[in-house]
């Protein structure tokens, strides 16, 4: 059994017991979250596809940790002009463990 749900403007394909990194959520570690924006649920060979969401579909997850991803370096320069600009960015994320899928 797996499901596709939407969180933080992105779609995630998950199964029970899987740990997934999502965009940062303002929820404490150890809390339980319900995702109601379920786009598809698959059980064996049968599929339920929503238009846009599956009616009664829910993905339940437990927050495992919060953190920051690896640094992405941005470099901009103009040739022959002695101009160079460098910056870095680390995106915040929330790790969740999928505890239940229902449709």
From Swiss-Prot:
InterPro entries: bL21-like, bL21-like_sf, Ribosomal_bL21, Ribosomal_bL21_CS. GO terms for molecular function: rRNA binding; structural constituent of ribosome. It comes from the Bacteria. One of its GO terms (cellular component) is ribonucleoprotein complex. Disulfide bonds: none annotated. Pfam families: Ribosomal_L21p. Keywords: Ribonucleoprotein, Ribosomal protein, RNA-binding, rRNA-binding. GO terms for biological process: translation. Signal peptide: none annotated. PROSITE patterns: RIBOSOMAL_L21. This protein binds to 23S rRNA in the presence of protein L20. PANTHER family: 50S RIBOSOMAL PROTEIN L21 (PTHR21349), LARGE RIBOSOMAL SUBUNIT PROTEIN BL21M (PTHR21349:SF0). Part of the 50S ribosomal subunit. Contacts protein L20. HAMAP family: Ribosomal_bL21 (MF_01363). Belongs to the bacterial ribosomal protein bL21 family. This is Large ribosomal subunit protein bL21.
